[in-house]
From Swiss-Prot:
Documented EC number(s): 1.2.1.71
InterPro entries attached to this UniProt entry: Ald_DH/histidinol_DH, Ald_DH_C, Ald_DH_CS_CYS, Ald_DH_CS_GLU, Ald_DH_N, Aldehyde_DH_dom, SuccinylGlu_semiald_DH_AstD
Disulfide partners: none
Protein name: N-succinylglutamate 5-semialdehyde dehydrogenase
NCBIfam families from the UniProt entry: arg_catab_astD, PRK09457.1
Top-level taxonomy: Bacteria, Pseudomonadati, Pseudomonadota, Gammaproteobacteria, Vibrionales
Length: 485
């Protein structure tokens, strides 16, 4: 039973699916995808449940969400184990994701009251009241890299605001999604308030194209996001929020400070989660001369020693595999393409067991036209620059704009950087993948259009209703011209 529709676990009626552990290639889940008809059943169930859920007192909605948070905390080790098993990420890392699921719920509760609650003030004897109302039926598309944490950051705010939801997880992480839905079921969520449809592209297309949804929250690739954007053109009545990827630049100044701390920050930025975070550094800008040489030599040396392995190996690895062998092959192909364009391999990506790919560092300063691509894996491109304005100009040469970073102890350099860089998340002397749940997450250009995560997700799950209210009608001392009573 792979679909959760109207509070019932159902078998899919579409094509067969399975999920493999990307390290061992062992099958860990199997089922059948939802058909277009089943997707419509889920949307209809959500529409029917909306009538009651939107008028359910906030305290009751909040109680269900808080019960879910308790269950996530209680079962955090099981969740972490399932994420590790299905994504291949090391268990130490997936434990942090399970913890983040609980933390994001607390943020969402606070955000509801601060951003979409009810506010009132008096204006010349009239009550000016701001209320918020749910959008309706929301579709949530989840990614595979954080299959528990990221969908949670959309589903929880949507439910708190009184929306009902149809969730379509990544077809690469169906088991994590299924285990998470079981916790929602245990939390006492009424039937139809949250539904899940499993499947690949046909299932996603059916959900995105359903006339019964009022909004769609998407986290995933730029290519898929752009397809959705075109699909929703001419439909201003539907809310579409896209969180996509980035070709993220990291600039290292000559005034970088301590060498090993800088190298560690680069490694954490480029190779955490085997490079499968949308904020990972893809392009590294190093100064020409001995300062840049020292960093590059130490970086290659340290990266070559990174421990890579299965999710449950002891001692724990820093990196696991790519999500699939297809994804792993894509990184090897990207490396070959950069070499064909004139890139020099300083550290070669090599295929290992399952979907393992070792880190690659490629010098691409002599590549005439560097492809503006998000290589979603452990592939770091190195470019040498002359001065900071040169580095920032090169860093901004991308259609994306998700994250960027500067390593520098010089305050004036940091001021120049934040005044001129084009990105939504900009860090100084910290890894690019570090972001606060209280801050907007996203960026301009091909990286997305809104910021519907964590604290700011509340803004995209409810619409504001503004009212001017008086106890009774009033006749002014002076009537408007042209009116006689």
């Amino acid at each position: 039973m792979t679909q959760w529709i109207a509070g019932n676990w159902l078998a899919g009626k579409g094509e067969a699916m399975n999920s493999l552990n990307p390290f061992s290639s062992e099958e860990i889940w199997q089922g059948d995808a939802a058909t277009a008809e089943q997707v419509e059943q889920a949307v209809s169930a959500a529409r029917e449940a909306l009538t009651t859920w939107r008028k359910t007192d906030l305290s009751e909605r909040q109680a269900v969400v808080e019960k879910f948070a308790e269950l996530v905390k209680e079962h955090s080790e099981h969740i972490a184990h399932t994420i590790a098993e299905e994504t291949g990420k090391p268990l130490w890392e997936t434990r942090t994701e399970a913890g983040a699921m609980v933390g994001k719920i607390a943020i969402s509760l606070r955000a509801y009251h601060e951003r979409t609650g009810e506010k009132q003030k008096d204006i010349a004897g009239t009550a000016a009241v701001l209320r918020h109302r749910p959008l309706g039926v929301m579709a949530v598309f989840g990614p595979y890299n954080f299959p528990g944490h990221l969908p949670n950051g959309h589903i929880v705010p949507a439910l708190l605001s009184g929306n009902t939801v149809v969730f379509k997880p990544s077809e690469l992480t169906p088991k994590v999604a299924q285990e998470t839905m079981k916790l929602w079921e245990q939390a006492g969520l009424p039937k139809g308030v949250l539904n899940m449809v499993q499947g690949a592209r046909p299932t996603g297309e059916a959900l995105a194209g359903s006339k019964g949804i009022d909004g769609l929250l998407f986290t995933g690739s730029a290519n898929t996001g752009h397809i959705l954007h075109r699909q929703y053109a001419g439909q201003p009545g539907k809310m579409l929020a896209l969180e996509m990827g980035g070709n993220n630049p990291m600039v290292i100044s000559k005034s970088y400070g301590e060498l090993d701390a800088t190298v560690y920050t680069i490694i954490q930025s480029a190779f955490i989660s085997a490079g499968q975070r949308c904020t990972c550094a893809r392009r590294l800008y190093l100064p020409q001369g001995i300062e840049g040489d020292a960093i590059l030599n130490r970086l290659v040396e340290a990266t070559a020693k990174i421990r890579i392995g299965g999710p449950f190996a002891e001692p724990q690895p820093f990196m696991g595999p790519q999500i699939s062998e297809r994804a792993a092959d894509g990184i090897i192909a990207a490396q070959a393409n950069l070499v064909s364009l004139g890139g020099e391999v300083l550290l070669e990506a090599i295929r290992g067991q399952g979907a393992i790919v070792s880190p690659a560092i490629i010098e691409v300063s002599n590549v005439a036209e560097l492809p503006d691509e998000e290589y979603f894996g452990p592939l770091l491109q190195v470019v040498r620059y002359q001065d900071l304005p040169d580095a920032v100009e090169l860093a901004n040469d991308t259609r994306y704009g998700l994250s960027a970073g500067l390593v520098s102890t010089d305050d004036s350099e940091w001021q120049y950087f934040i005044d001129n860089i084009r990105a939504g998340i900009v860090n100084r002397n910290r890894q690019l993948t570090g972001a606060s749940g209280d801050a907007p997450f996203g960026g301009p250009g091909a990286s997305g259009n809104l910021r519907p995560s964590a604290y700011y997700a509340a803004d995209y799950c409810a619409y504001p209703m503004a009212s001017m209210e008086g106890e009774q009608t009033e006749l002014p001392a002076q009537l408007s011209p042209g009116i006689a009573l």
